[in-house]
Design a protein with these regions (language model features):
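Hydrolase catalytic cores
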Residues: 39-42, 60-66, 91, 98, ...
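C-terminal outer-membrane/trafficking sorting elements
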Residues: 282-292, 296-370
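Active-site glycine-centered loops adjacent to acidic/histidine catalytic or metal-binding residues
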Residues: 134, 214, 294
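Subtilisin-like serine protease catalytic core
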Residues: 1-10, 14-74, 88-91, 124-126, ...
């Protein structure tokens, strides 16, 4: 760790700038153990023993988990840490945690969990969020979907924009403990997998190394890989990195709710050409100038310009691709146009605005927060 570039740190439990153990309880419960193992997997640098994929990055360290207790304030700490990270220029947020004690499977819809919503907002603001899928894979699915949450992924792994990470062994086989998908609304989870069985890491209690297992160890490997991809493509958005990693993983042709899209392939992801819109390819005849505010509650205004007279359609879709509302479906005259959309009566979450003219189309993501 001596060579790592830690530019700032903050303890959101004790509200100070020290992320090491500070209290007797933290010592007794081994507050430092989990974070040390995870951070070493991500960033450790000891040639011949351990080299994490992101060892040459800059780091912000945030302590949000009160290990002796499991309470909802930890979600608030996580949200505060995401906001702090975004304000301080974070490109990737790696977390090895999950919240399930006060949620049911019915809540894993991408729109309910406090941290789930925060991840979608952070992604919109330019922070790629990666989190562990969870270690409840040996449990049985709850008889009633609205019973206590086990077996499935937990918040914030259910977020629409997150990269949730399952665990495989050295042979690429799914770990028996790795939590499963799908989300309650039917999306495949996890997104990808990495090694999380007998993963090499630092021993937090001695000057040595050890192995550890869990999706807590697979998530930082994917986070480090994402940092490498971003170093090759600094202009990519979080969703472009997410797409590249998923579309180049080894099960992309047969994704399922154990492996997701499979084990990542970093070099293939770097070479991947994302399907995101190239601004230079957008026709001159029209453009979306602004959608504001975004995130919004409950109304937002869409401003766009039509270069020539012609038929225009503007639709709103939810995250599953279902049509929510058609706002425009008529001939428009050339010029600037403004439309206010009211989402009252809809659930909080991610929606997509799609505008179409004979000359082309464009899609933009919006976030509705109640």
């Amino acid at each position: 760790f001596d060579s790592l570039d830690i530019i700032d740190e903050w303890d959101f439990i004790n509200n100070d700038g020290n992320t090491a153990n500070e209290t007797v309880d933290e010592d007794n419960y081994g507050q430092h153990n989990h974070g040390t193992m995870v951070f070493s997997t991500l960033a450790g640098y000891d040639p011949g023993n351990l080299i994490g994929p992101a060892f040459d990055s800059e780091f912000l360290l945030a302590k949000t988990e009160d290990v002796p207790n499991e309470s909802q304030v930890e979600e608030d700490n996580y949200v505060a840490a995401l906001e702090w990270g975004e304000q301080n220029g974070a490109d990737v947020a790696s977390s090895s945690l999950g919240y399930l004690d006060w949620y049911s499977y019915c809540d894993m819809d991408g729109n309910t969990g406090v941290t789930t919503i925060a991840v979608d907002i952070a992604t919109y603001l330019g922070v790629l969020c990666i989190t562990s899928a969870g270690n409840w894979g040996t449990s049985e699915p709850p008889p009633d979907p609205c019973d206590t949450l086990y077996y499935y992924i937990s918040a914030p792994a259910d977020a629409d924009s997150v990269i949730s990470v399952g665990a495989v062994n050295s042979e690429g086989d799914i770990a028996y403990f790795s939590s499963h998908g799908p989300t309650y609304d039917g999306r495949i989870k996890p997104e990808v997998c990495a090694r999380g069985v007998s993963t090499w890491c630092v021993n937090a209690n001695s000057d040595s190394y050890r192995t550890a297992s869990g999706t807590s160890l697979s998530a930082p490997l994917v986070s480090g890989a994402a940092a490498v991809i971003l170093s090759a493509h600094p202009d990519w958005t979080p969703m472009q990195v997410r797409e590249a990693m998923m579309m180049t993983s080894d099960r992309v042709d047969t994704p399922d709710n154990d492996y997701g899209y499979g084990v990542i392939d970093v070099m293939a992801a770097i070479d991947y050409e994302t399907s995101a819109i190239d601004e230079n390819s957008i026709p001159d005849e029209f453009s979306i100038l602004n959608i504001y505010p975004n995130p919004f509650n409950p109304t937002t205004t869409m401003q766009f310009k039509v270069g020539t007279d012609g038929h225009t359609s503007l639709h709103v879709y939810d995250i599953t691709g279902h049509l929510v509302e058609t706002i425009i479906n008529e001939k428009l005259m050339a010029g600037d146009h403004y439309y206010k959309w009211d989402a009252s009566g809809l659930s909080s979450g991610i929606y997509f605005i799609h505008i179409n003219l004979p000359t082309g189309n464009i899609t933009q993501k919006i976030t509705y927060l109640k």
